[in-house]
Amino acid sequence: MALWGGRFSQESSALFKLFNDSLPVDFRLIEQDIVGSIAWASAITQVGILTEKECTELHQALNELLAETQDSPELIIASGAEDIHSFVEQSLIAKVGDLGKKLHTGRSRNDQVATDLKLWCKKEGEQLLGLLANLRAALIGLAEREIDAVMPGYTHLQRAQPILFGHWCLAYVEMFERDISRLQDALKRADTCPLGTGALAGTAYPMDRVKLAKSLGFASPTLNSLDTVSDRDHVIEICSNASISMMHLSRMAEDLIFFNSGEAGFIELDDEVTSGSSLMPQKKNPDALELIRGKTGRVYGALMGILTTMKALPLAYNKDMQEDKEGLFDVMDSWSICLEMAALVLSGLQVNREKTLKAAKQGYANSTELADYLVAKGMPFREAHHVVGEAVVSAIAKQTPLEELTLVELQAFSAAIEADVYDCLTIESCLAKREALGGTSLSQVRNALATKKENC
């Protein structure tokens, strides 16, 4: 039976019920709905709606219901209830009779679902923080293992300057640390309790909402009942955080897909995160990474979905807001599995140091060093840049690296070039000169790694 049937003389059509009911989605809020109901029973006991005996009986029945259903979603969905709130109330009435009908006194599904959703976001958000920390640790471990492997750094997907593989790893550590910080901030803003604000105007019963909030683990209650039931900022913010983090995951996946390709051959992925072809026996496909990249789109879609849903709603609850959960749940599921999978990929990744070093020595990645050499000889940088560009064109025509041009050939571009030029054109010199904070010299990467390990 619906919770609102008294106003109506006709039953809902089967099509409307199918269209309107949210239980197949919001059954995932069973724990939060019951926990919130237990707290609400205590709150209305304190204002005289329930006796202590009645409160105890409701608490016992609600805890029994939680034990029966927490790991059995099929039992919830099979009930045919309109939503998770209806399911809990109907199940409670079946257990304790008319006493169960008292529980909703002073409460609306509007503040109830807002509370459920914030409780769920808080719980899932903490789990996501753990997964982000695990991925961060996996990157730090990989950076430590391969800290001095030399590889080409790219701009425009063209070899630009040599870097250390450890430097590449720590670049993504920075990104995922920002993701952690953003999610922590979002969870702080979500840490306010909606319960006790009613449908939109507040509850008519003089309960202690501060005490109620604390009993549910919130830092404080919300302060405006109208805003409270209108608000889905926490959903939007978490979906936004997930979208940024998935963008980072997708970029890392793209890098690794390229590094793993036959054209690069920089890394080897473990068999446990790859698959083969049904036709081509030789294939070993980076499916885990490609799926991370692919799932990013659905997370972006959910963010745009909830933003579009909320953009023109008048204040207080509107049924449009029922559409918040399906996207949120999918976002959190996708983000979670991608974080776990990324950490697994990194744990088994092997670097082919011979190939990365060979690639770093190609593509005239030491050209900037030659320009800096000329600057040290007194030439303005813009002029040095032009001179080196001409030298590179000549080297390309001769199909030889810059460092293999003869001194006479180099001096044809500038008389400032002397025999000591060859010392600055080595890979070792290119890396060692990047000594400023944040650079890719081995000492800087070691310092950065030590700092990250201290903060784990």
Curated annotation (Swiss-Prot):
Entry EC number(s): 4.3.2.1
Subcellular location: Cytoplasm
GO CC annotations on file: cytosol
Leading EC class: lyase
Catalytic activity: 2-(N(omega)-L-arginino)succinate = fumarate + L-arginine
Keyword Cell wall biogenesis/degradation: no
Gene3D superfamilies, sorted: Fumarase/aspartase (C-terminal domain) (1.10.40.30), Fumarase/aspartase (Central domain) (1.20.200.10), Fumarase/aspartase (N-terminal domain) (1.10.275.10)
Pathway this chain belongs to: Amino-acid biosynthesis; L-arginine biosynthesis; L-arginine from L-ornithine and carbamoyl phosphate: step 3/3
Keyword Cytoplasm: yes
GO terms under biological process: arginine biosynthetic process via ornithine; L-arginine biosynthetic process
PANTHER family, per database record: ARGININOSUCCINATE LYASE
Similarity comment: family membership: Belongs to the lyase 1 family. Argininosuccinate lyase subfamily.
Name by which UniProt lists this protein: Argininosuccinate lyase
Organism, scientific name: Shewanella pealeana (strain ATCC 700345 / ANG-SQ1)
Gene that specifies this protein: argH
